[in-house]
């Protein structure tokens, strides 16, 4: 596979070298040069590495000079077309061509009496050089190229005679459309405030276009240009409103909405105009008063009900409604009067689109105050005298105004109910988390206290434990058990110390005050009894050796209010029921191994091993094991252990601090320069996958030892210094 790729790459390089030689030695043959340029364009389009290689062998600069110096128009057109395609394919070629000299040459082509095709190719090259390139946006303004583009925008086609069936008119329209697209990239992506300020001088001409022609071929480019020039620039938005642009857009939107009932294309085109209106009022909600004169809200609601629109188009309409009603009570009332609020609630409850739901919530939030005012009475509605008279006239014409008020109350109640449900869910979630955390802390403190009392009375517990014939495994709450599952070493002692029955009696007698203080903990245990019963029944028999019905008895006795009485009654019933079962004789075997292995031959080594392997240690032997573990832990920390001089036959695990001591120094990696193929792989990978360095590393055959961070550093280095090819 690699040999085939290498062979194709070599063939591509050979072809480009031959084609470049053909361009150089066929200066008198315009047709041959055109064919060679078209072939170069085709090769560069098929192989992304071809553009890089063509730039390296000097072909890019030769074609640039050829476009300027050739006497044949067809060669100039082909050369510009090839330059644009190569720059569009490779960002480094774009940066190489992005010079003031080339912009001046392109400006001369556009200003001179050149044919339509040459001007189109010149505009195409400008479009490619400016797109996603702030340097290109600056040069297109400083060289005066944007001035020539503005003049072409005004004069290429006539506003009154637009017959696209005519071949000459259609070619002029194609040039005008390319100019619109180029102006769009001059002002946006990235946003350029200075170019936006310059292009706003074209707004009056754009308004004339919208007034005289409502065909999609004109409205779509004009709306794209206006929307991108207005975007995120409040000064330009104010200027657009001052020259009557918002009024013109409103009139066009009204006409398209009226036509949308008959043609689907009008509905789609109305959405395009709606997006442009939204771009104008998004940062200045007060401009919504202009839209209220044309009752745009009612038109948008009617357009929203159009069945042919998808969710994205409906979202644009709803977002525009939100900006219209954000700071304009007239539009809010218009929305309410045209049953817009029920429509928003229906969209909120039925739609599964998250963005659509957010837009509907935005509209409902804007209309909350006006809904409250209308739900009270007409007299309390705070409009001036003229507006009050208007409302009275409306009430005369509409006999069902009371029905509107009733709907307003219902809608307001529904909004408050939705908000209240959301707040209650949030409060319940926070209370649940607080209860869980407080319960876990209380239970852990209780176990620590009980464990300390149990160790202090170890000898007494041993005497009492020997007089009884069974052991009862106590249960733990969900919080402690989850901790025991995740960290066995930390919870080893509490699990072992929870076995003896009489230890529970002693703890109940001497910790009565503690149980009373922890009554809230007992209540939490009562709430999780069902979970504990299931959890205990599924646990390992090696740890829990009590019968299954113990959990049932506990559940029945939990309602007792006194914690001490609760614990005593449960233990008494468990002891009586347990001694009566046949398993009593079997449970006698579950005793401390240190107590029942007296007759066996034991020494210091096997006795310690026997105690550590026993899950049922008595208090005395448990204290012995803990003391031995502490002693051995201190021994491991001593100087002898750190020097790896071990007195025990078994090798223990190295201490954690040993790995952090400065010992060996990591071996430095051998430097490997990036080859040409690796650089090509890197560019191709970034183009296809973006900045996902791991994916690029595994997708291409880089040298052994390459890492993702190497690719990232190399790409950023090439971006800043394109001349560095391999380092």
Curated annotation (Swiss-Prot):
Q: Can you name the source organism?
A: Homo sapiens (Human)
Q: Where is this region: Disordered?
A: 457-493
Q: Into which family does the record put it? A: Belongs to the TERB1 family.
Q: Which residues cross the membrane?
A: none
Q: Name one GO cellular component term.
A: chromosome, telomeric region
User: Does the record carry Nucleotidyltransferase as a key word?
Assistant: no
Cellular localisation: Chromosome, Telomere; Nucleus inner membrane
Full protein name: Telomere repeats-binding bouquet formation protein 1
PTM (free text): Phosphorylated by CDK. Phosphorylation by CDK takes place in late prophase when the cap exchange is prominent. is important for the stabilization of telomere attachment but dispenable for the cap exchange.
Chain intervals with Basic and acidic residues compositional bias: 457-468
- Associated disease: Spermatogenic failure 60: An autosomal recessive male infertility disorder characterized by non-obstructive azoospermia, due to sperm maturation arrest before the pachytene stage.
Please tell me, according to the UniProt entry, what happens when changing residue 79 to V.
In SPGF60; uncertain significance
């Amino acid at each position: 596979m690699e040999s085939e790729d290498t062979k194709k790459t070599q063939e591509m390089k050979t072809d480009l070298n031959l084609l470049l030689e053909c361009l150089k030695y066929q200066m008198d043959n315009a047709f041959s040069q055109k064919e060679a340029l078209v072939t170069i364009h085709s090769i560069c389009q098929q192989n992304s590495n071809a553009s890089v290689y063509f730039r390296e062998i000097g072909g890019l600069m030769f074609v640039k000079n050829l476009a300027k110096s050739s006497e044949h128009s067809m060669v100039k057109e082909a050369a510009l077309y090839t330059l644009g395609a190569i720059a569009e394919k490779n960002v480094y070629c774009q940066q190489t061509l992005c010079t003031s000299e080339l912009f001046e040459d392109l400006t001369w082509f556009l200003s001179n009496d050149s044919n339509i095709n040459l001007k189109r190719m010149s505009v195409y090259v400008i479009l490619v050089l400016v797109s996603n390139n702030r340097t290109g946006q600056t040069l297109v303004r400083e060289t005066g190229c944007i001035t020539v583009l503005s003049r072409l925008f005004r004069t290429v086609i006539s506003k009154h005679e637009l017959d696209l069936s005519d071949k000459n008119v259609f070619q002029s329209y194609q040039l005008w459309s390319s100019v619109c697209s180029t102006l769009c990239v001059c002002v946006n992506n990235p946003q350029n405030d200075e170019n936006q300020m310059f292009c706003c001088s074209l707004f009056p001409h754009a308004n004339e276009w919208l007034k005289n022609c409502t065909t999609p071929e004109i409205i779509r480019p004009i709306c794209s240009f206006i929307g991108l020039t207005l975007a995120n620039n409040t000064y330009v938005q104010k200027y657009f409103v001052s020259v009557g642009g918002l009024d013109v857009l409103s009139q066009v939107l009204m006409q398209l909405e009226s036509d949308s009932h008959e043609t689907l294309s009008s509905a789609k085109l109305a959405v395009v105009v709606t997006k442009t209106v939204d771009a104008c009022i998004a940062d200045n909600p007060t401009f919504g008063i202009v839209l209220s004169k044309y009752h745009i809200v009612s038109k948008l609601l009617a357009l929203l009900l159009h069945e042919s629109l998808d969710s994205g188009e409906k979202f644009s309409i709803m977002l525009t409604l939100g900006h219209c009603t954000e700071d304009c009570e007239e539009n809010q009332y218009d929305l309410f009067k045209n049953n817009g609020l029920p429509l928003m609630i229906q969209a909120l409850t039925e739609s599964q689109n998250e963005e659509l739901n957010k837009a509907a919530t935005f509209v409902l939030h804007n209309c909350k105050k006006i809904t409250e005012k209308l739900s009270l009475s007409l007299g309390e509605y705070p409009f001036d005298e003229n507006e009050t008279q208007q409302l009275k006239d409306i009430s005369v014409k509409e006999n069902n105004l009371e029905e509107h008020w009733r709907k307003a109350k219902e809608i307001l109640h529904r909004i408050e109910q939705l908000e209240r449900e959301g707040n209650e869910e949030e409060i319940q979630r926070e209370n649940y988390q607080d209860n869980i955390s407080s319960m876990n802390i209380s239970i852990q403190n209780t176990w620590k206290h009980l464990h300390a009392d149990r160790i202090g009375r170890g000898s007494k517990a041993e005497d009492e434990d020997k007089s009884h014939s069974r052991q009862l495994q106590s249960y733990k709450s969900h919080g402690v058990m989850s901790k025991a599952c995740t960290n066995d070493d930390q919870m080893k002692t509490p699990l072992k110390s929870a076995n003896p029955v009489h230890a529970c009696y002693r703890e109940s007698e001497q910790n009565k005050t503690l149980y009373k203080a922890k009554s809230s903990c007992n209540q939490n245990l009562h709430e999780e009894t069902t979970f504990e019963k299931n959890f205990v029944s599924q646990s390992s028999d090696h740890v829990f050796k009590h019968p299954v019905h113990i959990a049932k008895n506990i559940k029945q006795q939990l309602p007792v209010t006194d914690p001490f009485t609760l614990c005593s009654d449960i233990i008494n019933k468990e002891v009586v029921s347990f001694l009566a079962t046949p398993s009593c004789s079997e449970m006698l075997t579950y005793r401390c191994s240190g107590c029942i292995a007296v007759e066996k031959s034991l020494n210091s080594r096997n006795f310690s091993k026997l105690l550590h392997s026993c899950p049922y240690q008595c208090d005395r032997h448990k204290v012995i094991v803990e003391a031995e573990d502490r002693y051995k832990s201190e021994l491991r920390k001593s100087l002898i252990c750190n020097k790896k001089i071990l007195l025990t036959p078994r090798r223990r695990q190295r201490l954690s601090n040993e790995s952090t001591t400065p010992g060996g120094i990591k071996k430095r990696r051998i430097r490997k320069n990036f080859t040409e193929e690796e650089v090509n792989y890197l560019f191709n990978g970034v183009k296809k996958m973006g900045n996902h360095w791991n994916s690029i590393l595994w997708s291409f055959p880089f040298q052994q030892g390459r890492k993702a961070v190497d690719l990232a550093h190399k790409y950023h280095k090439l971006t800043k210094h394109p001349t560095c090819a391999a380092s």
